Amino acid sequence: MSYKAGSTKFTGLLFCALLFLSQPTIATEFWDLPPLPPADEYGNILINRTSNSKGIKPATFSHWIHRRKFTCRVCHFELEFNMKANTTEITEAANREGKYCGTSGCHDGKASFGHKKPDCEKCHNGDKSYKKERFSELSRLPAARFGNKIDWGKALNKGLTTPAKYLSIKPDADISFKETLVLESEWEGTPPAIFPHRPHTWLLDCSNCHPDIFNIKKKTTKHFSMIANLGGEFCGVCHSKVAFPMNDCKRCHPAMSD
């Protein structure tokens, strides 16, 4: 082998090695990742379906306050809140009738504050940073790099959080579907994404993902892509606003280097 050929081959190998080692950096620079709010606001939403039109401030909802106490299933299956904000026809009248937030075990005036006038501003304040001083209560939980900067999965596995799986509608049985999916990347040089069902079925009901988000029967998953995820589809329904964001590449692509 000539010196020139050997040098070219070495340069190529070096480039590939550097490319692999810098994958997370390239990913965050290549993809148009949305800017992240402060850790104490990540997952906070404003419920404003009808509030402004009625001269009322939008209601603030903090996922990190609630997810310590309840699994996703409680709100998004049992209480029938849609996965997308401001698409559930929640009303104050319904709350007072014991539906949605007013369900027994939630904001019923017993388990937590109810719907009397002195309590109104605890929700209807229009401020995503409301009660951010409580975020320090989470300082003992395992750290993560993005989102709330809390590794909620580790916190759950270590018993540092013990969210309730139900209020009154108990799951028929523990969902034992544990299959782990390996999703090959559409980009050369990027390692596959790993999807473990078990951590998701512990927090969610199967119907939270299937068939609306992932319709396996109709083969809509053939349109699954990183671009679709970043657009709020598929994994992006959760992993863009509440669950750890897609900036945290290695959480899904574990073979990536730090």
What are these regions (language model features)?
Residues S2-L13:
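Bacterial N-terminal signal peptides that target proteins for export
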Residues A5-G6, F20, E29, H197:
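Intrinsic disorder/low-complexity signature
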Residues G12-S22:
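Bacterial N-terminal signal peptides
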Residues I26-D258:
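Short sequence/structural segments immediately N-terminal
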